[in-house]
């Protein structure tokens, strides 16, 4: 037992070192990663990169949310987030790790397919390169939830992991958070966006990124006379923001509306119904809470959707291997509360295998890709 505890502590230390390297890694020239592409499970594409000198360990990258309308592939922009000078696969091989990633066979809400594909990726890697001494996971955004579930469910396969800004605490709460933003937008700015928060017209999905947002929504939320209303909307929705920073507020609202418009129908189809529920929600922080709560639209989640979330998208906090989470305290897309909730789950299991790193309070304006950039600025580590 003492040896097992020591091994876990050593691995936790290694993961923390990897996290700190992510924090401070500069733009130095990378070693040639020796990458190769191929196909594995059901024709899914993989990327495998080997370092010049392999330390024997494999780092699997579990990327974040991708639009359901995008091509199914390992998203290049998530391998090199924010146009950084070094890619994640180069970073991994610089540290001596073998690197591997796979597409998930689908986009949008892909947690369950991701779990299957990364597991098969280990088999594929082993057949091509030999068995790794340890397999570690690096999950970003939606991939952070996938990594948490994978570590909880397959500690025999994965030795530990690192997750950045994921909804690993309470996926149902994350779903409601996204829905609240759209419900409140429709209250404050009625008849701007067609459809409802739980039923998105396909024409809106098709045109959101090619003109509708830019031509119809953005002029409304950037109008100087609406600045106070936008800030109140974010306050009521519980979106982290800095008072008076209108550019960041608009960017946060743009991102959250993007997820609602682009992702809602896909999520409902995969969950077996629409998952958003605000029947019992009491909104506060507005100029007139009574009027807001009386008039805001109310929705009841489909029972099947919530049951699917509970069964397939909800972490337990039961860890048998070390896990490091990194999360921005001011994250407007996936609130820092997700890290807090997950920490409470782990603590309830009397585990000491979680390290939580809270990053600088720097809000960011973009979806999952930029979460990587912001999360790697983390500073404060708290071990539970």
Indicate residue ranges for each PLM-predicted region.
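Short beta-strand/loop motif that positions the catalytic acidic residue
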Residues: 325-327
